[in-house]
Amino acid sequence: MSKEAYFSGESIQLSDMLRAREERALRQLHLLKEYPEGSLLSVTMNIPGPIKTSPKLLEAFDIVIKAIQTALADDKICYQLRLLPTTGYEYYLITSLPSRDLKLKMIALETELPIGRLMDLDVLVLQNDLPHSISRTVLGGSPRQCFICSKEAKVCGRLRKHSVEEMQTAISKLLHSFFNKDNQSSSSDKTG
């Protein structure tokens, strides 16, 4: 499948992204204040470039959301919200699970799911009356790796080490491999 199959959505402007980030931060703050006893999970996708949505990206997003819901099946979920703006898909969940435990489950999910690397599974807490993300490194996890060179993703991002084209190609290959593997296992389940 071509790269265009995964990046076929509407192109957005930087101003749209900045507005979406601001709205997301306000939504996170509101949820943390509305559910002070709960833990907040905020899910977005790591999609470089001006196209953040497409049918295939939504399919991948929804697979991860379903995996999250399955991972938290034994925990009380107080609130869920799934948003599909052109600036990128968003999912919010409040659970009674302590934030540290929630983050550990999300790190495991990011690691176990081949497409988990495409997601930001942020667990947020209020700190000085502002949303603050719990870092995987604080809990003993290793920093996220770059899709392309396997170095620390934040460093590659900060240095703009890889072009949008390179990153989209790597994401397309990852998704193509995931969907083909998923289809093959579904086919063998039906024939076996």
From Swiss-Prot:
It catalyses: apo-[citrate lyase ACP] + 2'-(5''-triphospho-alpha-D-ribosyl)-3'-dephospho-CoA = holo-[citrate lyase ACP] + diphosphate. The gene is citX. GO terms for molecular function: holo-citrate lyase synthase activity. The keyword Transferase applies. This is Probable apo-citrate lyase phosphoribosyl-dephospho-CoA transferase. Pfam families: CitX. Its EC number is 2.7.7.61. It comes from Streptococcus pyogenes serotype M5 (strain Manfredo). One of its GO terms (biological process) is prosthetic group biosynthetic process. Transfers 2-(5''-triphosphoribosyl)-3'-dephosphocoenzyme-A on a serine residue to the apo-acyl carrier protein (gamma chain) of the citrate lyase to yield holo-acyl carrier protein. InterPro entries: CitX.
